[in-house]
Amino acid sequence: MGLLDSEPGSVLNVVSTALNDTVEFYRWTWSIADKRVENWPLMQSPWPTLSISTLYLLFVWLGPKWMKDREPFQMRLVLIIYNFGMVLLNLFIFRELFMGSYNAGYSYICQSVDYSNNVHEVRIAAALWWYFVSKGVEYLDTVFFILRKKNNQVSFLHVYHHCTMFTLWWIGIKWVAGGQAFFGAQLNSFIHVIMYSYYGLTAFGPWIQKYLWWKRYLTMLQLIQFHVTIGHTALSLYTDCPFPKWMHWALIAYAISFIFLFLNFYIRTYKEPKKPKAGKTAMNGISANGVSKSEKQLMIENGKKQKNGKAKGD
């Protein structure tokens, strides 16, 4: 007998039981959350984080439509300040995690979460909270792309990376603000110091961009980061580290998704043969010296005619 053939009372009982189990599970998960962070900003409830992420996705959808008939914003100074501000923020996070884990005697192989109010543990938890906040601030990367009409930069990889990092790290801070969680955040914040340094330098304009030949190595660094994260997490599973197993497996799956996406980006950007462009220094159909391509072609053709002493049709 199927569920649809059951008596109304029994169906209601099944639904009621399922709802009660869900509520009990929710209460249980809340009971094992990290008490140290429960009153920190954004940590009382998931709704502020989910609301910010929803607004972000709405802007990704509506922003390009709003900018369609508008001139792109000129944001050089804003970008310089923002990018070097992110360098300082990530440097602060890296330093706090490194010093906190060092003083707490953390192991890079296996480290359980200490939920005590030990000064070093609270320092690590606070640094991880700042790391979570930094992922929310990074939504501005996308906002600036859209306001500058660089919509080609707002790829699936870009949106997936930004949206999931901020949203999922709320879970990390709520339940495991310490222990093994420090390693990935420490590694990622270090890479972001390098990454935002590059972006900050590019914001100065073309005169410095010729010295920034190392852009492709940023993607390689990120790919190495994901492989190191998987290896570190797999080692923790192998040693039966007393850290939530579900989070270990979730982290491995998450890192694998990034490897596929970043590898695809790297191949398309640096390995596939590029289509020939109309002119290396051309900007919107006009070359660097202000002469359009069609005018240049006519000048070349006229020069050939004069060299031969007569026009082609004479």
From Swiss-Prot:
The keyword Iron-sulfur does not apply. Residues 305-314 have a biased composition (Basic residues). It is found in: Endoplasmic reticulum membrane. Pathway: Lipid metabolism; fatty acid biosynthesis. Its EC number is 2.3.1.199. Keywords: Disease variant, Endoplasmic reticulum, Fatty acid biosynthesis, Fatty acid metabolism, Glycoprotein, Ichthyosis, Intellectual disability, Lipid biosynthesis, Lipid metabolism, Membrane, Neurodegeneration, Spinocerebellar ataxia, Stargardt disease, Transferase, Transmembrane, Transmembrane helix. InterPro entries: ELO_CS, ELO_fam, ELOVL4. PROSITE patterns: ELO. Residues 293-304 have a biased composition (Basic and acidic residues). It comes from the Eukaryota. It is a multi-pass membrane protein. Expressed in the retina and at much lower level in the brain. Ubiquitous, highest expression in thymus, followed by testis, small intestine, ovary, and prostate. Little or no expression in heart, lung, liver, or leukocates. The chain crosses the membrane at residues 42-62, 78-98, 127-147, 165-185, 188-208, 217-237, 247-267. Glycans are attached at residue 20. A motif (Di-lysine motif) lies at residues 310-314. It is an enzyme of class 2 (transferase). N-glycosylated. It catalyses: a very-long-chain acyl-CoA + malonyl-CoA + H(+) = a very-long-chain 3-oxoacyl-CoA + CO2 + CoA; tetracosanoyl-CoA + malonyl-CoA + H(+) = 3-oxohexacosanoyl-CoA + CO2 + CoA; hexacosanoyl-CoA + malonyl-CoA + H(+) = 3-oxooctacosanyol-CoA + CO2 + CoA; octacosanoyl-CoA + malonyl-CoA + H(+) = 3-oxo-triacontanoyl-CoA + CO2 + CoA. Its main location: endoplasmic reticulum. One of its GO terms (biological process) is long-chain fatty-acyl-CoA biosynthetic process. Residues 275-314 are annotated as: Disordered. Belongs to the ELO family. ELOVL4 subfamily. Oligomer. It is linked to Stargardt disease 3: A common hereditary macular degeneration. It is characterized by decreased central vision, atrophy of the macula and underlying retinal pigment epithelium, and frequent presence of prominent flecks in the posterior pole of the retina. Ichthyosis, spastic quadriplegia, and impaired intellectual development: A severe autosomal recessive disorder characterized by ichthyosis apparent from birth, profound psychomotor retardation with essentially no development, spastic quadriplegia, and seizures. Catalyzes the first and rate-limiting reaction of the four reactions that constitute the long-chain fatty acids elongation cycle. This endoplasmic reticulum-bound enzymatic process allows the addition of 2 carbons to the chain of long- and very long-chain fatty acids (VLCFAs) per cycle. Condensing enzyme that catalyzes the synthesis of very long chain saturated (VLC-SFA) and polyunsaturated (PUFA) fatty acids that are involved in multiple biological processes as precursors of membrane lipids and lipid mediators. May play a critical role in early brain and skin development. This is Very long chain fatty acid elongase 4. The lineage of its organism: Eukaryota, Metazoa, Chordata, Craniata, Vertebrata. The gene is ELOVL4.
